[in-house]
């Protein structure tokens, strides 16, 4: 049976706590393979995609997209991921191969990421809806959005850089809730949503919405041709007869004949 990435939204009316659960394993697997990621970058890409899928649960406009850009002082360099309102995921890490760390199963954030700055942007074509900067996703939720919420992420890759799983949970205590959001911590991510919620202490939570997610990029051969066509005539004349253009968001490469741009 073909596996499908999902986002599930649940709500416990008694405790006034909402939970969003995502599984982006298939999208992360395809993107990591497309970028030729090593095990470490595949791991962090998987967790970043889960974060974007969680935060994008609140996108409302038809063409809206939520992006997370992270810059860090560690060797990974950062990442850029995006999830659209209709569930399309794409993204990349700055470094794809980390020779010093790829041979080890350890994922030490302090060594691989160092200090971080995260920018979360919600936008539609031609307009930014909102933007926030923080040192972490939880910091963005608490600081920029003033919300009592926490994100929990889980990812696993093997030494062949295959993503084995990529999942996430966003827990939020609503303003009229008397609960502390830190009380609801998932211990396992490899179980059905209803079991995970019971494990977290929310057995009475009810499903609100389910949406499918997928890897999809807006790049195309036509966009590649248009990009070269935007160069001035002198610049195009200096190009070889064929040129390869790689999309940095998904790793797909297009071979363009430069005479197509004239």
Spans of model-derived segments:
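Cys/His-clustered metal-coordination modules, chiefly Zn-binding fingers
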Residues: 184-262
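Interaction interfaces in information-processing and related assembly proteins
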Residues: 1-207
């Amino acid at each position: 049976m073909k596996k499908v990435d999902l986002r599930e939204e649940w709500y416990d009316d008694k405790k006034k706590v909402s939970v969003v659960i995502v599984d982006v394993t298939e999208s992360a697997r395809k993107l990591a393979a497309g970028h030729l990621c090593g095990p470490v970058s595949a791991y962090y890409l998987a967790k970043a995609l889960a974060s974007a899928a969680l935060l994008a649960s609140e996108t409302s406009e038809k063409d809206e997209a939520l992006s997370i850009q992270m810059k860090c002082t560690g060797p990974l360099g950062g990442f850029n991921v995006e999830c659209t309102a209709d569930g399309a995921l794409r993204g990349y890490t700055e470094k794809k191969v980390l020779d010093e760390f790829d041979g080890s199963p350890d994922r030490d954030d302090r060594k691989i990421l160092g200090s971080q700055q995260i920018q979360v942007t919600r936008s539609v074509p031609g307009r930014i809806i909102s933007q926030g900067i923080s040192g972490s996703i939880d910091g963005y939720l608490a600081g920029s959005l003033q919300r009592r919420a926490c994100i929990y992420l889980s990812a696993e890759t093997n030494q062949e850089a295959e993503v084995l799983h990529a999942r996430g949970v966003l827990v939020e205590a609503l303003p009229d809730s008397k609960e502390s959001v830190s009380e609801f911590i998932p211990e396992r991510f490899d179980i059905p949503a209803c079991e995970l919620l019971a494990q977290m202490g929310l057995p009475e939570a009810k499903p609100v919405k389910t949406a499918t997610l997928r890897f999809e990029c807006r790049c195309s051969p036509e966009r590649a041709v248009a990009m070269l066509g935007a160069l001035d005539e002198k610049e195009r004349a200096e190009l070889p007869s064929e040129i390869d253009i790689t999309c940095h968001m998904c790793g797909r490469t297009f071979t363009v004949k430069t005479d197509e741009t004239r």
